[in-house]
């Protein structure tokens, strides 16, 4: 069997047999809002008790508070839910959308292309079987979250987000967990508690978006903005040479498990429409697309043959399926193309290169630019957010921050104001390849010219010398720009520049970028960001290995690495690891210092200082005698979990 057929078979088996797979020692908990149907999911990690004293015969333990973390996995980690990918996810937001009474259910689809696909019987085996009824704004109504926010309305989505962003941090009592460094926010407004009113205000001002198409009621509300937690996007999608519907659905579920806050379907191969339907009906996170890719497929890949009519039908098709945000490369103007002539890598954006080719072939501005107001009118009817694409982003560090890049950025700022006239939500896409010392300029320019609309960047990659490791080169830049104020980071996988990522590449990219986003939250001083770090550090110092694994971003890998050298169960309670061994563990020695300090009725630092300053010669004699009396052994075990177990 070929590798391609094997991959597809395995993916189909995954879909057919998918069952709930909770994280280790974690519980799915729901925090209820002001109404019973606002139930916000979080992952609660239970921790073992700390051994704080006593003897082998009578040890004294102290309980550790469970730690709650942000959870993007939807019902796929909820043991109370029966997974059925053929029937899709629960329609969480359906009632909220209906009760606003500003939408209507359509009798039929509006897109000509969708009608053609539905009438094609040869697609019956591929087609998602449980197609939903389509909604659209009633005539004269706008149904975007930005519109509601500007009207002073706090929607259920906004209340949901406030609860989700807070992650229940007010419940913590342990001062070890709640301690946090101040951070440098670079002007971000980070309140100690996120309220529904704060969410509404940030959306109303355009500083944040809630991607939430009325035809994607399965999505769990989330927010993108620099005054909230830094988010991560995962890219999936087939190509003309690889992947199937089954594999893309598998990647979707995998992406949400490992922390993808949104997912972009960048399919360019066969059956794009059907693939997207399967993804949307089973996605608990917002889905984005680049509609230009599908429009190009409709004209057989000939960029010059693209028309506004084809593009318009594609936008309506995808909006009625439920796509939450469109990447639109409307800022690439004809006069900017010559600016790329001296670049090392020219135009590297797929969407940008398509638009550039069309503009040169017709010698006029692109239909995305000239019909931008019509694009906004379509988006306002379904609440599709616009992700204004950077078609002239630098594809090498040599081209970073050049005239072409920033000229397009200024145009994106102008388009942002136009979209806001229609109450359409906007985020701005950014680079790309940028060396570390030039990253902050990107954030500063974006804030200046794009009116504080959220920034969404691909990395940036900080060097060009590491094919196969570009998740690392870009993770460095992502952490930095997230700190400076970027609201969402688009992940890069190890396959970047080399090939289409598989399931494991998706996981590696996501873990790398969740790490970058978290590092940015810590550096900004986001309230509560340090709780998980503190809990893991405390577990590490106390040799609570299982807690260390379970608190990590990737428990499976952490546990596997530990077990490579200490596979026995006793290794899970040992007061050392294979790095230093039992006699040279710095944390074990530190514990012994603390025990000594307790014996001196003082703090560890004070006890050591007293011993150093108080009659040094006498102190040395005393310790010499103690050492000999104890058998001249350099290290002695402290009371430990394994000793308690033996006792």
From Swiss-Prot:
GO cellular component entries: cytosol
Keyword Iron: yes
Cofactor(s) listed: [4Fe-4S] cluster
InterPro entries cross-referenced by the UniProt entry: ThiC, ThiC-associated_dom, ThiC/Bza_core_dom, ThiC/BzaA/B
GO biological process: thiamine biosynthetic process; thiamine diphosphate biosynthetic process
Gene3D superfamilies from the UniProt entry: 6.10.250.620, Radical SAM ThiC family, central domain
Residues that, per the record, bind Zn(2+): 433, 497
Reaction catalyzed: 5-amino-1-(5-phospho-beta-D-ribosyl)imidazole + S-adenosyl-L-methionine = 4-amino-2-methyl-5-(phosphooxymethyl)pyrimidine + CO + 5'-deoxyadenosine + formate + L-methionine + 3 H(+)
E.C. number: 4.1.99.17
Pfam families: ThiC-associated (PF13667), ThiC_Rad_SAM (PF01964)
Pathway where this protein functions: Cofactor biosynthesis; thiamine diphosphate biosynthesis
Region (Disordered) location: 623-647
Similarity section: Belongs to the ThiC family.
HAMAP family per UniProt: ThiC
Function: Catalyzes the synthesis of the hydroxymethylpyrimidine phosphate (HMP-P) moiety of thiamine from aminoimidazole ribotide (AIR) in a radical S-adenosyl-L-methionine (SAM)-dependent reaction.
Protein name: Phosphomethylpyrimidine synthase
Protein encoded by which gene: thiC
